[in-house]
Regions:
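N-terminal Rossmann-like NAD(P)+-binding subdomain of aldehyde/semialdehyde dehydrogenases
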Residues: 1-127
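Conserved small-residue-rich beta-alpha loop and adjacent elements
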Residues: 120-152
Length: 152
C-alpha cells in the first residue's frame, strides 16, 4: 500500500498542515491501494507565499535560463517514465497502450513548452507600438487530477 504524506512547497517536500486523508483505489480491483494526506488552506497559503517570494528573481531570468530550467525538468520527468507508467497502470487501470501514452505525456508537454519558448518573442512590434511581455505575478491553478500535465 502506498502512503503519500508529503507535498512540495518552496523547493522541498514538507508534511502538510492538513490532516485529512484520501483513499486511492485501484479501479481494476476496487481495492484501496494507498492513501494521500491532503493539503489544506494553510498549505495553499504557504505555497502562494513561496511563489511570491520566488517571483522577483524568476521574473528576471532570461529566456535561455528558462529554457535550461525546463530542460532540467524534462530530463527529471523523462527519467521517471517507468515509475509514471507503473502508477498510471495501477491508479487508472487503463489498457497498456493508453497507459504508455499517459506516462509519456508529461515529458511531452514540457518538451512542447520548450519548443514554444524557443521561438517566443517577448518584444514584438505592433504597428507603431511595441508590445513587451513582462511577468505580472503569481497565478494559482487547480487542475483536474486526471490530466495535470495537460492543464498546466
Amino acid at each position: 500500500m502506498h502512503t503519500i504524506e508529503q507535498i512540495f512547497i518552496n523547493g522541498e517536500f514538507v508534511t502538510p498542515h492538513g490532516t485529512e486523508w484520501f483513499d486511492l483505489y485501484n479501479p481494476a480491483t476496487a481495492q484501496v491501494m494507498g492513501q494521500v494526506r491532503l493539503a489544506d488552506e494553510v498549505d495553499a497559503e504557504r505555497a502562494i507565499a513561496a511563489a511570491k517570494a520566488a517571483f522577483p528573481a524568476w521574473s528576471r531570468t532570461t529566456k535561455q535560463e528558462r529554457i535550461a530550467a525546463l530542460k532540467r525538468m524534462h530530463a527529471a520527468v523523462a527519467a521517471r517514465h517507468d515509475d509514471l507508467l507503473e502508477a498510471v497502470i495501477e491508479e487508472y487501470g487503463a489498457p497498456a497502450s493508453r497507459s504508455a501514452w499517459m506516462a509519456s505525456y508529461p515529458a511531452e508537454v514540457i518538451a512542447q513548452a520548450i519548443e514554444a519558448l524557443e521561438v517566443f518573442e517577448f518584444v514584438t512590434p505592433a504597428g507603431a507600438a511595441t508590445v513587451q511581455m513582462t511577468p505580472l505575478g503569481v497565478a494559482g491553478l487547480i487542475t483536474p487530477w486526471n490530466s495535470d500535465a495537460g492543464f498546466i
